Amino acid sequence: VKAVHQAYLASGCNAIKTNTFGANRLTMGEETCRKVIEAGWNIAREAAGDAFVFADLGPVPMTDAKRALEEYRFSVDLFLELGATNFLFETLSSFSCIGEIARYIREKQPEAYIIISFASQPDGFTRSGQLASHLIHQAEANPAVDAVGLNCVSGARHMISLVEQLGTVEKPLSVMPNAGYPTVLGGRTIYEGDPQYFAGQMERLHAMGVGILGGCCGTTPKHLAATVEALGGSAPKEIPVVQPEQKKPQPERNRFWETLEQPGKKPIAVELDPPESGD
């Protein structure tokens, strides 16, 4: 994990987040959750050097808002004890209890920097059926929140459309797209988004006023290095038109088809019927 942090920092990133997205007592129990948060913070802190470290908290599997708030408080208290001052609540589908936990952090650590980020489909709606733009403005109106944004689910190109739908956002805006969309190849889920294309879209987002840029699912150090290079420390004067690189699909070997194409060979199909009550 430390090596992964260092790879992203070497690509030019000036902030990393702890490897604690799914850490909560509902999914792993209190003892394991505590160990994961402590290890996640310490590893990120060791790797960061002068870079910022954000305590990363994903959505809590909600039974109800009260229980979710208790889970967030448990994690937040641990991070605060460890010395965290930057917090990222990401991949959210609603604002339920998030405003309250943001105020809780602010009371405990007045110097905290808190980012609230929602996950939206390309059509503008979150998994809970709420408009991401409404959630963004709801979060922005909370005095305890420092920055708002979007992450995950959508690729960089669709993030541009989502940002266009937001209207005026007074607080700093964060966008962390996926590296395109996932495909399953050979039983593995992969993202084939080209780093240069990704960087071009990120450049457009920066020109639109997005002040905090990063990557979510499928983004590698190459994607972020290309983004850092494309930005060059300032927003472009014109929004560039970037065309994605056309990739040729790689043929997959099919032994059944190969047998059909060979003269004199016949495929043999066998049906296996398991015995009754067999396991």
Please tell me what each predicted stretch does.
Residues 1-279:
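Domain-level signal for soluble alpha/beta catalytic cores
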